[in-house]
């Protein structure tokens, strides 16, 4: 899993602290240096690491820690609390519209696994009693519509498509279709690009303006490390995203992207893809990482 390497390194720092009994400021300073290295090696952004270590150090050298009977436990607790806070504290839930259908716009770069993961998310919510509709707004990638129809069929979720038309018109027509057919949740599978470009962002802004989605979720591959943060910031600047879905968290990614995204964009990670299968998705719980 993405956080395993980081957990191992932090545990070895904690083990060293536990073996000491009383702690001095110097002990904490050394431990913080190791924590800093572990986070940087896990691909957490430098600015995030710097702020994190400063926060933990400030709390850890207080009298309540140094004079406590279990100073090591206090330091470990502070590190864990600050890590959880960094990723957003509690699980951030989806926002549902007061008047259905709730429109969820899925955005991201090509190759992030957007089409598969939009279907995974629709499947998860269907299991929770929702009636989702998938709308094919990616008219550029030749196989995108077929791919969405295939995963829709596998999950028994309807797919609305109009071929290679105008994505804004397709999105609007998809929502009308949902109203007529009793779908209370609409997922717009939008086009990705290999890299961020103006044409893509303009198209996505036009879709957003036309349908006013309740959620704009950015799908990001956890394996791309530091690039994930730049991607998240670019999409957030253009679209004011409401949250992030991290995919491939089951891989050997270093996990730093997850720690950096929330801290730098202020937007929560809402869901995590944890495997290849269509049911391998779950709400992201920072406190369980």
Residue spans for each PLM region:
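Conserved phosphate-handling catalytic cores of large alpha/beta enzymes
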Residues: 172-175, 183, 195, 201-209, ...
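Conserved residues at beta->alpha junctions
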Residues: 108, 136-139, 191, 219-222, ...
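Short, small-residue-enriched loops and turns at beta-alpha junctions
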Residues: 112, 140-142, 167-168, 192-196, ...
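Primarily NTPase-proximal linker/entry elements flanking Walker-type ATP/GTP-binding cores
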Residues: 6-137, 144-164, 170-190
């Amino acid at each position: 899993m993405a956080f395993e390497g980081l957990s191992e390194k932090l545990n070895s720092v904690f083990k060293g602290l536990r073996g000491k009994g009383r702690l001095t400021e110097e002990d904490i300073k050394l431990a913080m240096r190791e924590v800093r290295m572990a986070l940087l090696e896990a691909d957490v952004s430098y600015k995030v690491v710097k702020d994190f270590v400063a926060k933990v150090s400030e709390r850890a050298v207080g009298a309540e820690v140094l004079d406590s009977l279990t100073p090591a436990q206090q330091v470990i607790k502070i590190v864990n609390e600050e890590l959880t806070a960094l990723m957003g504290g509690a699980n951030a839930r989806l926002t549902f519209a007061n008047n259905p259908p709730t429109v969820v716009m899925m955005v991201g770069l090509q190759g992030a696994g957007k089409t598969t993961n939009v279907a995974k998310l629709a499947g998860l919510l269907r299991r929770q009693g929702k009636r989702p509709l998938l709308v094919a707004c990616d008219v550029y990638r030749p196989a995108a519509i077929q791919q969405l129809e295939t995963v829709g069929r596998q999950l028994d979720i309807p797919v609305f498509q109009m071929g290679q038309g105008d994505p804004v018109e397709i999105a609007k027509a998809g929502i009308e279709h949902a109203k007529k057919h009793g779908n209370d949740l609409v997922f717009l599978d939008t086009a990705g690009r290999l890299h961020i470009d103006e044409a893509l962002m303009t198209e996505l802004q036009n879709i957003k303006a036309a349908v006013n989605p309740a959620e704009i979720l950015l799908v990001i591959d956890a394996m791309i490390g530091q690039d994930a943060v730049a991607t998240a910031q670019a999409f957030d600047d253009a679209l004011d995203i409401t949250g992030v879905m991290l995919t491939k968290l089951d891989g050997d990614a270093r996990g730093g992207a997850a720690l950096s995204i929330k801290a730098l964009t202020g937007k929560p990670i809402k869901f995590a893809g944890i495997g290849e299968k269509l049911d391998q998705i779950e709400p992201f719980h920072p406190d369980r990482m």
